[in-house]
Amino acid sequence: MHGVFLNITRNSDGDYQAMTNDRMFEYQRLAQEVYHAGLSARLARLGYALEPGMYGEPQLKGITREQIEYFSGRAAQIEDFLQKKWGINRKTATPEQKQAAWEMTRKAKKARDLDGLQARWREEAREIGLNEVFPGKKVNDLSPEKRLDIARDSLKFAIEHHTERESAVKEGELIRTALQDGRGKITIGDIYKVMKEVTSSGELIRQVDDLAGSRQNLVTSREALEREKRILSFEKSGRNKVEPVMNPLQAENTLNAIQEREGLTLNAEQRAAARMILTTDNRYSGINGYAGTGKTTMLKPAIESLQNGAAFSALTNAGYRVIGLGPQHSAVHALKDAGIIESRTLQSWLADRRAGKDLTGKTVVVIDEAGLTSARDLESAMKRIEKAGARAILVGDSKQYESVAAGPAFAMLQKAGMETVYVTEMQRQRNAPEHIREAARLSIDSPEKALEKLSIREIRDPQERFKALSEEYLKSQDPKETLVLTGTHEARKSVNENVREALNLKGKGREFIRFETGDFTEAQKKRINSYEPGQEILFGKAYRLMGVKVGEVGKVASVDKEDGTVRLKMEDGRNVTMTPRKLSGKDHEIGQRETIELSLGDRIRITGNSLRLDGVTNGMRGEVVDVSGSRIMIRFDSGLEYGILVGKTPLEIDHGYAQTGHSAQGLGAQTVILDLPSNSQTLNRRSFYTNLTRTKNQVKAFTDDREKLAGAVKREKDKTMAHDVEKAQAVERKPWEKARKIEPELEI
């Protein structure tokens, strides 16, 4: 059965015509879910039992995946084309890619004997054990009130799920998620009624209709908007409210003395940033420095001046306690290198209730990689700073990767007028060839021109390209100074496997278990629909009532959607019952255990913080130096060496030959090898700029399509702000306020 989305528009003369397909592609996913929701609701009322298919589509319960695939030759053709052409599947492909695959694999239809065809199908169905599926007892229609209750709950979940990572969300995606969550019970009409309720109450704020039809409208939550307002209010109210540490002359003299003693040379921009830290009278100020501009070098004399400025000028107001906070451990290391010994991750500082109580008016909090800090975390930090009368310096690059969580707070504060010094002169590539220096500069605002400065190999087949990336890595003289950056985990794994095979490391080491985490939001992890038999759950904290310990893994044995419980089979054989809606979603992960081998000489990368080894943190790289006995000995690039016990508990370690670009922010290497697939959703202006500027000297780039690559690196992938939605509210036009029947009519 298919749902058909017709491109028919009636003009003012009463004639019908086809319009541009852009808006149809934009709403294709929503239209498909409207169809699925209506179909599921009616099938459920007729008594048919349903279950989600491979791609989330409704399937009749009792029909196996093998039986479905037997009669899905066309779908298999498209799946095979997507895999061979772009290395993707129907779930990860865009509507445009699926359309292209459908067109390029389509054959002209031939006239057929329908009676004979049906007879053949029945015979084949019997051969594979496919019996007719009969409906069970008819289900009475849910009352309108009950359907609205379900729709309210589903929409609430959709809002929590989407606003966890984006402050403003495409309206169609929000509705689609709500329909998916309530599938079989509600339809689009129910969701529209609830949308009217939440917009009328102000819980959800909706952007003006885009009459040009170029994109979907955005919506945001009142909570996200209020959070942004509080952040902006903190910054604005803190202007001209603190005593400068030094006057301009004292700052110049102190910086000169420290530079001379330490043998440092700051350029004009770095010096201006350091001077601002010492002379500002604002509680909050920022330093926006491009990748590799020497932000750590700039911080060193400024931090020394804050802490010990009185040693250089008796008249200064120095003697400050400086705390360093970063969203990643790489940022924490950079802060310590800058002289801030008291540095830790922002998340651990916020989780420590005692940490904020010892702040005073003579405390400076330096938040590094501020562009990776979510609005929620920044607001929490600002509350502590505000209460203590302390001050904060936000350091980052608003053009690099943004926080996975919602809210580009650092960029928002700059737009609102926060005092900010910009550091733009790149230092990381100062000894690189001219074409590399030029490519790095151009990648900031003209990425398509940066491509012209690079030597790029075009290899269309994904597996062949991954093999070429591996071969390039093997040519490197110093593995410690080589980064292979990919956009997907599939590419990362393939490169790692290829390198290990070439180095003859396979089958020569010890196997251990690691946990591959799925991509679930906290809201999803609290939802029973996210669980299915075969998944595995890793617990990040102990739950006494359930009887599970930190680090334990349980396999999902069964899911009871009626009472909302998940039954787990633990490693020791005991059964544990978990009720996801009663958990926070923060302290457990849904994923799968996998076995990984480490051999003598393997390069590794730490992927979490569960090892609890002094000085070893997420993102650190090293080499396996011994695999004898029950331990794997690792020598880290930092010089530390530890033996790690191999057991049943998953270890957060992976092969370290290739990694995704997002995990490499803050790193630098002599040689950077880039995988740039033009069709990848992870390739955009931000990722290209961030990944390219990891290099100190050389860049080796690979793509599937050189012609399309220029368009891919120009794609904008910016986080949205709730304020952007509020600004457009004045001329809002809501479709559900018009009398119309949106629910599709299906004859069953």
Task: Indicate residue ranges for each PLM-predicted region.
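Conserved ATP-binding/catalytic motifs of P-loop helicase motor domains
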Residues: 1-748
